[in-house]
């Protein structure tokens, strides 16, 4: 009896606690909703002030953006603690040299080369100019120079000579790129400037010319899509104006990072437009619904539309931000650069969507009404019934396609040669090809060794390096002079170039191209030799840095993929209070990514290394928006008492148009830029994103509802908000 009473009291206590929790939850939810409505009413009331402030903020944002430095040196984003980057710092600190270029001189006499060398050396940013005449002066005759050194700087068959130019700052500095541009003008008729400094200079020229065009293309194509899929000409313009202002705010706040990469600059506006367009579309659709609800009271309708948009967009925007935040976990800090800027962009996009855009719509209400037209896109919501009737077939297609998609995804070919991203018309690319053709010269390595290394060790180390496969030339000051020439016969200029303070510099010329398997194996062998002679010696240069880039980004990709999946999994878990939905949604979205990234594995298309890292996170973040929209409607329908099939069919029918419009805008913005850009890194990323938008659209419209049909019982049993106990009682 006592046990029975105790159990009864416990049961009543549990009922009481549950009731209290339920009541508290409802009250909190009501307060949040009321707060959002108050915010919406505040925006409507102060819409003129909001527009004045918004337009005024464009001025400081624009000034800040103009004064934000753009970094064109991708390798500078490698971790500072690795040996190649430490060696780079030593080069700058000890030798006053941060980069080098090879200049191919055709049909020029020695006296003309000497004059040109003096002119180049006078350029701001140039430290030294080295050619065989630098060493072979009046005190050291030509006959004293080893034939291999002379041949490395001369090609009698092509009647050309080679000049090595070193710069006082790194290859991505403004001073170095300006020096390269001036040098190009000086030597353009009969000479070619090769090397990464020249590639960076060409990249800067192309990006600064093309970046504004990217924005124009993305905006025009997005407006074309919205013009077809919406009932107004003016509203798409207001969308673009609102998003454009958010983009300027985002770019204007990049000063907090000191600088941004050229890749971030080129992609930010396009991606922010494509990713945040969803929020504008949602606000407009919600506004239209609220107008019907409140009998044409547009101010009240807008206040409630803002409230609904904030509540609905919060979950999807957080997941999108999470995808970009995952990039910040990369050791290769280009990910941090892009991740921070894009995460900020989403935040500014959401803020603009619930403040600036409503104010613009209300301000332009009369014009909007006058310019309305018939929607040209057919109503595609009818496919919902077909999907729920054929979900088993679609589930089989999912499984059948998944296996080859994963195979293709794991067999993608990736390239790391940064010079390879340039178009064939780029002057630096032509110079690099000529350098390879006339001098069989691919990568150039630099050895930084202690200056007190004995002459014998220096010569022996160089001789050992010469035996490594693919080494065309290996020289130190000691190896050039040999054991018989005394130091006092060496020109002071040559001494200062190769030896300075605590370190000496040695050059190794490779026949292999940067980022190739052959050169990476060569670097490993040379490092072993160098370390045998001195633990303090370092091997640096473009190829060793690129080898580190390969190793680091391979680890980064796995880390970023894991972090992005975990973050989005947790966000879906919290938003839907479900154990099963995060698994289903992430699995379906990853399937879309596998299909997109698996296609190049079958076509044999080589992708730039950064593409695989960036695409995964951006497509994950963007696709989850579509998935959350449909899942929210599915949950609402089930909660109102609808059976499985009608609930899923209605959710799909209500979501399809929004998903298609959003995906097509994303596709249009990125595909247009991908076709136009002749910088392969930018073009490849945009084409992949465009294709990913279409694939994600099909997956969300066809595969996700099929998963809901199959796992409905599991979802309802493991998720909050799918069952209304008042209806089932």
Which role does the model predict for each range below?
Residues 80-197, 413-581, 587-606:
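Structured non-transmembrane domains adjacent to transmembrane bundles in polytopic membrane proteins
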